[in-house]
Amino acid sequence: MEVLMTNESKAPAAGGAPKKLSARGLVKRFDGKEVLHALDFDVLDGEFLSILGPSGCGKTTTLRILIGLLMPDEGTLTLGGRDITTAPPDDRGMGIVFQNYALFENMTVRGNAEYALKFKPELKARRREIAQGVLEQLGLAEHLDKSVRQLSGGQQQRVSIARTLALNPEVILFDEPMSALDVETRLSLRLELKRIQREFGTTMVYITHDQEEAFALSDRVMVMGEGSIHQLAAPDEIIANPADDYVADFVVKNLRIKMDSLARFMDR
């Protein structure tokens, strides 16, 4: 089954990969208070980048600026060299997967995957084919005509991911998509996301407060605290050389605790 996405010689990002998404000097203020402090970062083509931090660190505000739900007070965003700073969400070349699935409960699995394609008239003739293709790739072939209410939480999240993939976005943003799922389902979905990234070279930006999840999934991790970037590096580099005491305490120490807990779960 042919789908819209292709994997033409794309591979997960390496150190020499070109920049896909660039932020320069991003500042955001609410009621006069600055909550993002001149953020500078790049997301490389085909990489999996996690933005990691506790509640209130600015990661969700950053996500909302990336997708276009908020405008920065200062700074610029470019995607593939195109300035998207003030572009509306549907003209940014990005897709988003939410924590709460955001599915239409009165529709079937297939209907949910097809829904976003209804706003792409040039794809009208292939809408059903594209939706079915991505659903099959995510292991949902047996559930196409079921109501999404009949699915488990993990299956519903797969439908949400399939709906985003069907649009073939240049970048997929994930807003803590696994926080409501049990441990086994989360582990399974991690494998799915890494497979998608590997097979299609999809650029992914993943928002999370979970250290173990970020380090298991990511090519690089951007550690945020109080509206600033404390470190942006590969997981091994952060563990070996935390940039400051904040990174050492929030990431490294907590990661070791979580890894010990996961090991005990896997040994059951």
Predicted regions: what is each one?
Residues 147-151, 155:
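Conserved ABC ATPase signature
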Residues 226-227:
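Conserved ABC ATPase "signature" C-loop
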Residues 232-233, 241:
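ABC ATPase "signature
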Residues 166-170:
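A short, proline-enriched helix->beta-strand linker immediately N-terminal to the Walker B motif
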Residues 52-54:
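The feature captures the beta-strand-to-loop junction immediately N-terminal to the Walker
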Residues 67:
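Helix-to-loop junction immediately C-terminal to a conserved catalytic motif
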Residues 83, 125-143, 194-195:
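Conserved ABC ATPase "signature" region
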